[in-house]
Amino acid sequence: MSSIKVECVIKEKNEVGESPVWEEKDSSLLYVDITGQKVSRWSSLTKQIESMNTEKLVGCVVPRQAGGYVIAEGTRFAFVDWVKRSITAVAEVNEKPNTRFNDGKVDPAGRFFAGTMSMDMKPDVVDAALYNLQPDHSVVRHFDQVHLSNGLDWSLDHRVFYYIDSLAFMVEAFDYDIQTGGLSNRRTVYKMEKDEGIPDGMCIDTEGKLWVACFNGGRVLRIDPQTGKRLQTVKLPAERITSCCFGGKDYSDLYITSAYIGMDAEALAKQPEAGCTFKVTGLGVKGIPPYSYTG
């Protein structure tokens, strides 16, 4: 097995870096800074970054098949025209006060799933929900009673939906109906250990194993959702790890975003790479290309 290497490749720091998505056509990484209210693209070829400001706190960004991107910002879905630098609202969700969209991803049929979170971030507050934007621009609400909606992905056969509500400290699974987008048979596939931090973003590899970013845990875990076992831990030089995705040639590199929000000067001095985006090579596994929203 080749040796694992962790490298800070995007040194421009994000207060809350999130939602990394690999764009194969131009070898670039798409991501957001939630509290910085911007969407960015980093070219792995030129090392240059292009950014665009959003109008609200932006939880996530996904590619759109028709061109440009779709974001979930504030309590709405919106289209992004990267060329014109314009944002067009598509659909608003009827959320409780003091909530906003957080992480999201496109399913294999082209639906854009995204969940919300309470800005209070208290264990007893369950005001959030999971939604998806349909290709016809209508919105489906799947379930509520969520603390802090976060990482999500689908099994390789598209029959299982994996989901993280961060403050539940677990990874869950649902039976998934790819024809309707329906969810059923909710169950737990992994419970976080105390030293692993808060489960945040997540992605899947070609072996069907899950990679879970651990906020305040300084690591990414590889989990077998069939057995509930942790298979591997990759430690990072930053505590506030937020999300991850595979990219690079053959999708063999793991890109990992991080945050520096809430860290004081002493903590930042100890973790000078907090807020950086890392690339991990030598893992010996590959990911799958992201899906694009079809609406």
Swiss-Prot record:
MF annotations from Gene Ontology: calcium ion binding; enzyme regulator activity; gluconolactonase activity; zinc ion binding
InterPro entries in alphabetical order: 6-blade_b-propeller_TolB-like, Regucalcin, SGL, SMP-30
Cofactor binding description: Binds 1 divalent metal cation per subunit. Most active with Zn(2+) and Mn(2+) ions. The physiological cofactor is most likely Ca(2+) or Mg(2+).
Subcellular location: Cytoplasm
Catalytic EC class: hydrolase
Binding site for substrate: R100, N102, D120
GO biological processes: intracellular calcium ion homeostasis; L-ascorbic acid biosynthetic process; positive regulation of ATP-dependent activity; regulation of calcium-mediated signaling
Record bears the keyword Isomerase: no
Reaction catalyzed: D-glucono-1,5-lactone + H2O = D-gluconate + H(+)
Keywords linked to the UniProt accession: Ascorbate biosynthesis, Calcium, Cytoplasm, Hydrolase, Metal-binding
Active site, per annotation: D200 (proton donor/acceptor)
Record-level GO cellular component terms: cytoplasm; nucleus
Amino acids binding a divalent metal cation: E18, N150, D200
UniProt superkingdom: Eukaryota
A Pfam family matched in the record: SGL
Gene3D superfamilies: TolB, C-terminal domain
Pathway assignment: Cofactor biosynthesis; L-ascorbate biosynthesis via UDP-alpha-D-glucuronate pathway; L-ascorbate from UDP-alpha-D-glucuronate: step 3/4
EC number(s) on file: 3.1.1.17
Function: Gluconolactonase with low activity towards other sugar lactones, including gulonolactone and galactonolactone. Catalyzes a key step in ascorbic acid (vitamin C) biosynthesis. Can also hydrolyze diisopropyl phosphorofluoridate and phenylacetate (in vitro). Calcium-binding protein. Modulates Ca(2+) signaling, and Ca(2+)-dependent cellular processes and enzyme activities.
Similarity section: Belongs to the SMP-30/CGR1 family.
PANTHER family for the chain: REGUCALCIN
Name by which UniProt lists this protein: Regucalcin
Source organism per UniProt: Danio rerio
Gene expressing this chain: rgn
